[in-house]
Amino acid sequence: MKFSELWLREWVNPAIDSDALANQITMAGLEVDGVEPVAGSFHGVVVGEVVECAQHPNADKLRVTKVNVGGDRLLDIVCGAPNCRQGLRVAVATIGAVLPGDFKIKAAKLRGEPSEGMLCSFSELGISDDHNGIIELPADAPIGTDIREYLKLDDNTIEISVTPNRADCLGIIGVARDVAVLNQLPLVEPEIVPVGATIDDTLPITVEAPEACSRYLGRVVKGINVKAPTPLWMKEKLRRCGIRSIDAVVDVTNYVLLELGQPMHAFDKDRIEGGIVVRMAKEGETLVLLDGTEAKLNADTLVIADHNKALAMGGIFGGEHSGVNDETQNVLLECAFFSPLSITGRARRHGLHTDASHRYERGVDPALQHKAMERATCLLIDICGGEAGPVIDITNEATLPKRATITLRRSKLDRLIGHHIADEQVTDILRRLGCEVTEGKDEWQAVAPSWRFDMEIEEDLVEEVARVYGYNNIPDEPVQASLIMGTHREADLSLKRVKTLLNDKGYQEVITYSFVDPKVQQMIHPGVEALLLPSPISVEMSAMRLSLWTGLLATVVYNQNRQQNRVRIFESGLRFVPDTQAPLGIRQDLMLAGVICGNRYEEHWNLAKETVDFYDLKGDLESVLDLTGKLNEVEFRAEANPALHPGQSAAIYLKGERIGFVGVVHPELERKLDLNGRTLVFELEWNKLADRVVPQAREISRFPANRRDIAVVVAENVPAVDILSECKKVGVNQVVGVNLFDVYRGKGVAEGYKSLAISLILQDTSRTLEEEEIAATVAKCVEALKERFQASLRD
């Protein structure tokens, strides 16, 4: 927000210079982005009057004038401005004057005619970019007065960044309140005298959306002169705030917006059919806006309508049909309180960002509308004339924001600030902020002012007290902290350790958005309902992720589109699953996921080009699981997942509970996502693995190990892992290692069966095993496999 320093000082005028004022505003939490003079550096320019104006005898576009600047004679000045005329009060640079850019005014002859000065435009004085003509001053401007003094050009434009919680500072009144509080000065508000109704004209107003519009004020003003010029003082204040003068009616509403922070709008009353209806738009309803563009409205957009059509987007932009124009004689002034939620995001949807929507999205003082209406009515009648009707007030008290009542405890205040502020000082600060304060024992009860809807909880009051007291006044004290050795459970497995392992295996960590495209997510998790955001950054980021796969697969596509075909990435982060049993109805699980695709190895002259397969990723995953000490308790089971290939995927179970999936992306999903080639993914619920099994030290056998190989024929649907587990269970005391080293299908093995070649490592810690014992254990394993899986030894 930009504003004039002199305008601010009309409300509150602390005895500090501009730099100190800017620093004070910054320290109050309203960061000053810049302080710029409102005009260039110049001197020797005074108010003058064009007494005579005649055509230059030797030039069609020049005029010869005689100008009174209050001296003992009239000055001859040649001027080329098209608006130069007799009787006009102007800004005159006299001989010896120096204009911006070190331009010195000297006596000269222009096309044979003497010129003893220059009639100046706004651009020539560095005031604005307007160079269409010379400055036209009011007829009562005192001749001979220094123009800097008359236009109050010894002023600065201050630009501040207003945080979303301080919407009350989007008007001069809000900044002035803060400056007054910080300097313990009274706030000098302009006198706003209610304008009595001189006519009975009204319009019927109906509010059909009270949740979106809690208060709507309307007032008819008849017989205005819309072509009346806006006073120079108002134009200058608007200009110094970065707003261009348009016409008197619009300038008045903009002035009130800047002064009080209350958006207003003026309708051409004669173009309103029937009356005003505040309602939600009909789906697909259209409205031609003031800038000539057509907006197609959604059913959640608030509109101001008459009995036949929409006239304006409520709190955002007016419509062309009902806008004020050169023929307007009667207007309806609108001043309303729209709830922030009913405005937020609607302007952005149509590519708009207006001063009104900026304020309504952040919140407007719900007690301000009557004051703003009276201020606008008074200014409008003073400038344009006319007669005002009564104020029409439609208010729904039930939906108006209520002022918060907050209890501030002394213990909380001292603990958060780390410094004791006297009771009477705390009370004084809260009252100067506009709170209604009741003192209690070691506490204060404060009712927040209507304009401070960001005051809701105790911490808000602590922040306000510290801010006004001054952060610089809180003494620095070293933090007293004893050095206590932290405890560490050996069973805690750091996620950082797992990340290091994956890095060592060639993976790179990525971080993707928690917001994802709901359409893509639905492809990966069909039929699963996700949490949708009410105000998303974009449609493609409007759902909370159900897994990390959505972001990881998008990252793979992004890399493949840039000729990076060998990708190994992983991510850890939260997923958000709807769960009625969880707080707020959403369960947040910490997940670890990874993706690989492309060649198994980097390109090398001595390595074959082989594409990664299921077992590459499963091997990496087993390395991660091995860190947890739970690998022996993990099972990989064939289980359907709509995102994975049915024949090249597995569910991961730990002690009978599913903790994740691993597999090749389903070919259909691969096609829809534009993935280039086979892509493999895994995902684990990390919280179920973080508590690792601490390895127990065991005696290392000094006796020789014995290997025996067996080949068993089993049905095709028998998982090899079950065969290995059964061998371990049967030979628990002597079998120290079981490994699958070959799978065979073909000649000698019936169709629907497979041959598994297994090595058994047998060893004892106390003695050398005899051949009979070894043979007995192997036979025991074979018998167990035969009983459970109908396995037979292969010939």
From Swiss-Prot:
**Which keywords describe this protein according to UniProt?**
Aminoacyl-tRNA synthetase, ATP-binding, Cytoplasm, Ligase, Magnesium, Metal-binding, Nucleotide-binding, Protein biosynthesis, RNA-binding, tRNA-binding
What InterPro entries does the database record attribute to this sequence? aa-tRNA-synth_II/BPL/LPL, B3/B4_tRNA-bd, DNA-bd_dom_put_sf, Fdx_antiC-bd, Fdx_antiC-bd_sf, NA-bd_OB-fold, Phe-tRNA-ligase_IIc_bsu, Phe-tRNA-ligase_IIc_bsu_bact
Entry's HAMAP family? Phe_tRNA_synth_beta1
Q: What are this entry's molecular-function GO terms? A: ATP binding; magnesium ion binding; phenylalanine-tRNA ligase activity; tRNA binding
User: What protein name does the entry list?
Assistant: Phenylalanine--tRNA ligase beta subunit
- Tell me where in this chain the FDX-ACB domain is found: 701-794
Subunit info here reads: Tetramer of two alpha and two beta subunits.
Cofactor binding summary note: Binds 2 magnesium ions per tetramer.
Q: Which family does it belong to?
A: Belongs to the phenylalanyl-tRNA synthetase beta subunit family. Type 1 subfamily.
Q: Which SUPFAM superfamilies match?
A: Anticodon-binding domain of PheRS (SSF54991), Class II aaRS and biotin synthetases (SSF55681), Nucleic acid-binding proteins (SSF50249), PheT/TilS domain (SSF56037), Putative DNA-binding domain (SSF46955)
**tRNA-binding domain spans which residues?**
39-148
Tell me the superkingdom of the source: Bacteria
Query: Where does the B5 domain lie?
Result: 401-476
EC code(s) of this entry: 6.1.1.20
Compartments, as annotated in UniProt: Cytoplasm
Q: Source species, please?
A: Shigella dysenteriae serotype 1 (strain Sd197)
Q: Please give the chief subcellular localization of this protein.
A: cytoplasm
Q: Which Gene Ontology biological process is one annotated for this entry?
A: phenylalanyl-tRNA aminoacylation
Reaction catalyzed = tRNA(Phe) + L-phenylalanine + ATP = L-phenylalanyl-tRNA(Phe) + AMP + diphosphate + H(+)
Give the GO cellular component terms, alphabetically.
Answer: phenylalanine-tRNA ligase complex
